[in-house]
């Protein structure tokens, strides 16, 4: 049976106590095929009852339960008959609220720790080795479990590493099962989701598409929608989903600022407009953007100018359209979480990169606001967007404008665009495109002496940046084979004008960022 709203899916909710890993918990549960949301720690009991989750997870957080202003839950939550898993601070809070004892640890644990499962019947550890390593990050610990709880695991510095009350289906783990540094963390979460909560894996992208198409049609009716199309994955998927729902009632305004990767604008038009039928107005505005950027070298100023100009071009085109009621955006669930709100809004001034004039009144529509980035990519493929377009690497809004260090000119953009295309082609030829998180070229504005033929040259240097990462928060430089780097370097020098040197950035993040500007 088709799902028509989120209440039709089994769900496990995560209450937010401030941990840096909160989004990961939600992601892991969704990866199991179970719908999950990250919600405020003080979510009302009435709202929880309305959502009817199969389980609740208390996240970790930086507080001590004894801190003034420490984040708490309504004690009534323990009377709902819903299974609860407390992670790190979540375990401490549950223990404290139910009569256990929490104290400051003599030896705080930050990093890898070895635990031993001491209860052979512990459901969270069912089917897992007795000894395993986990990721700890805590300054307090539970020193006495609440009445009715058994201790199920211990470590050298944390004698109560996991607790269980099977009768009430309350469980606690002092470590972070959601991070990959915990050896069997995902299995522990699976045991909670399926064996304890009895949740069904019925969260599918096909159902989401049907649900969203139905919601969009009900909301929009016979009215018109506009969308600012950047050429990126999020706005492209938003456009395609809206087109599936309302067809030509959608007009996407594609502001081509002339700082996209090689052939990228044409690829977007081919895939979305010609192949999928999305109604797109393409505005070729490179000259306009370059005029505004003339003489500007500060990276933050460049970003602001590009963002402001994007909005102005979008506004001019939007005003040409008549009787438009809705503005669509490619807002993702990560944006919703970071903004601290989960409520829809009607706007007068709103856009991804700036604000619309006060005299433009639109109602906001955000069909991707419940999805993470990887889910958006899956959705894009389901909607028929080409794989290469859906799986393009992260690309900054200002585009190549911040990969030209210093003043941006048409000639410099051409150098970066051509060198970047060579890098991509050779990485793909070597079969490395799925192994490297992100890779691109940079024009640092450095000139150096070289020799080409019988003559002396004094030309630009190209920098290659390639990194491996899991989430982009930290990154290591990619160890590309020397023969591949050699071929890339040779081709860039031979095929790109005004380049006589290629260097490879071997700095990790931190201390460097992935982008140079």
UniProtKB/Swiss-Prot annotation:
<feature type="active site" description="Nucleophile">
    <location>
        <position position="88"/>
    </location>
</feature>
<keyword id="KW-0067">ATP-binding</keyword>
<dbReference type="InterPro" id="IPR025777">
    <property type="entry name" value="GMPS_ATP_PPase_dom"/>
</dbReference>
<feature type="domain" description="Glutamine amidotransferase type-1">
    <location>
        <begin position="11"/>
        <end position="202"/>
    </location>
</feature>
<dbReference type="InterPro" id="IPR014729">
    <property type="entry name" value="Rossmann-like_a/b/a_fold"/>
</dbReference>
<dbReference type="GO" id="GO:0005829">
    <property type="term" value="C:cytosol"/>
</dbReference>
<dbReference type="InterPro" id="IPR004739">
    <property type="entry name" value="GMP_synth_GATase"/>
</dbReference>
<keyword id="KW-0547">Nucleotide-binding</keyword>
<keyword id="KW-0658">Purine biosynthesis</keyword>
<dbReference type="GO" id="GO:0005524">
    <property type="term" value="F:ATP binding"/>
</dbReference>
<dbReference type="InterPro" id="IPR022955">
    <property type="entry name" value="GMP_synthase"/>
</dbReference>
<dbReference type="InterPro" id="IPR029062">
    <property type="entry name" value="Class_I_gatase-like"/>
</dbReference>
<comment type="pathway">
    <text>Purine metabolism; GMP biosynthesis; GMP from XMP (L-Gln route): step 1/1.</text>
</comment>
<dbReference type="Pfam" id="PF02540">
    <property type="entry name" value="NAD_synthase"/>
</dbReference>
<keyword id="KW-0315">Glutamine amidotransferase</keyword>
<keyword id="KW-0332">GMP biosynthesis</keyword>
<keyword id="KW-0436">Ligase</keyword>
<feature type="active site">
    <location>
        <position position="178"/>
    </location>
</feature>
<dbReference type="GO" id="GO:0003921">
    <property type="term" value="F:GMP synthase activity"/>
</dbReference>
<protein>
    <recommendedName>
        <fullName>GMP synthase [glutamine-hydrolyzing]</fullName>
        <ecNumber>6.3.5.2</ecNumber>
    </recommendedName>
</protein>
<dbReference type="InterPro" id="IPR017926">
    <property type="entry name" value="GATASE"/>
</dbReference>
<dbReference type="Pfam" id="PF00958">
    <property type="entry name" value="GMP_synt_C"/>
</dbReference>
<feature type="domain" description="GMPS ATP-PPase">
    <location>
        <begin position="203"/>
        <end position="392"/>
    </location>
</feature>
<comment type="function">
    <text>Catalyzes the synthesis of GMP from XMP.</text>
</comment>
<dbReference type="InterPro" id="IPR001674">
    <property type="entry name" value="GMP_synth_C"/>
</dbReference>
<comment type="subunit">
    <text>Homodimer.</text>
</comment>
<feature type="active site">
    <location>
        <position position="176"/>
    </location>
</feature>
<feature type="binding site">
    <location>
        <begin position="230"/>
        <end position="236"/>
    </location>
    <ligand>
        <name>ATP</name>
    </ligand>
</feature>
<dbReference type="Pfam" id="PF00117">
    <property type="entry name" value="GATase"/>
</dbReference>
<dbReference type="InterPro" id="IPR022310">
    <property type="entry name" value="NAD/GMP_synthase"/>
</dbReference>
